[in-house]
Amino acid sequence: VPEIRQTREYATWYSRLRDVGAKARIDVRIRRMSLGNLGDVKFFGGIGELRIDYGPGYRVYFLKRGDVLIVLLCGGDKSTQASDIASAKTIAARWKE
């Protein structure tokens, strides 16, 4: 089972989510991901976009480091997707150093 770590940016985004239904769905998807079931994920430039088909279309961006580590970079929804991807790339670059 891979270890799951959260960046400060992800933790802040998640703590500000008010929709408990969204939080529950995100938690389930991350749990499934930790068990090897990535589900609806799109990869670009080494970054994964976990797509949650609920509400405004929540997204969780992550890095996968081998079979032992998944780093949750940041989150958002379909309306903030472009800026969230840019943020995820910046945060991922810090982890690659």
Residue ranges and their predicted role:
Residues 1-57, 65-70, 77-97:
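Basic, Lys/Arg-enriched alpha-helical interface segments
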